[in-house]
A protein has these predicted regions:
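Hydrophobic alpha-helical interface faces used for helix-helix packing
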Residues: 1-194
Length: 194
């Protein structure tokens, strides 16, 4: 729904970030795909369009309970090396370079229509317990995996949505979701860079 700083085919200026430059995430780390079925960098696209919009954790059942950082070996994952997370740094398609603040850092990648599609694209890193994000004011902040992220089973904000899913509404994904919106009147009191 174009709630973040970077929106395809749109021009956004600092003056458009009404939630405040220090309250808005501009970018974040992404862990590069190593070919090891890691949920943070190997996209799972075994999900339907409405599934992922209505339930951002729709891919969670495909996570290996014995190795919770990996997809089950029975899950069919795209294996083209050229389509790995972070492999095409200048490509604007979500899987390659984008993040969103739906699920907390280091959560699973769940997409529809492969690397050129849309989905849940949390930032990720090899750091223990979190990742770095770039705030719109230029500050770099380490955000923990345990950041308050609201109800991860709540549907996402979408064009034509109603209630807490309507464009312009506050994020249903708690503090984490609020940090990802630029103009939803979601200012925060917490100090992030301490």
């Amino acid at each position: 729904s174009g709630r973040g700083v970077f929106v395809a085919r749109s021009e956004v200026r600092f003056r458009d970030i009404l939630d405040g430059l220090s309250n808005t995430i501009m970018g974040g780390e992404i862990s590069t795909d190593l070919g090891d079925r890691d949920v943070r960098n190997r996209m799972n696209e075994n999900v339907g369009t409405t599934e992922i919009q209505n339930n951002p954790i729709a891919c969670r059942d495909d996570i290996d309970p014995e190795r919770p950082r990996n997809w089950l070996s029975t899950v069919n994952l795209r294996s083209l090396d050229s389509e790995g997370r972070g492999f095409r740094w200048a490509n604007g398609n979500g899987n390659f370079t984008s993040i969103n603040t739906i699920l907390p850092p280091n959560s699973e990648l769940c997409v529809r229509f492969g690397p050129t599609g849309f989905g849940v694209l949390p930032p990720s890193s090899q750091h223990q317990g979190g990742c770095h994000v770039l705030m719109a004011d230029g500050a770099v902040v380490f955000v923990t995996d345990s950041i308050e992220a609201g109800d991860s089973t709540n549907g996402t904000v979408i064009r034509g949505g109603t209630g807490n899913r309507a464009p312009g509404s506050k994020s249903p994904f708690g503090l984490w979701g609020a940090l990802g919106t630029k103009a939803s009147k979601e200012t925060i009191e917490e100090q992030l860079n301490q």
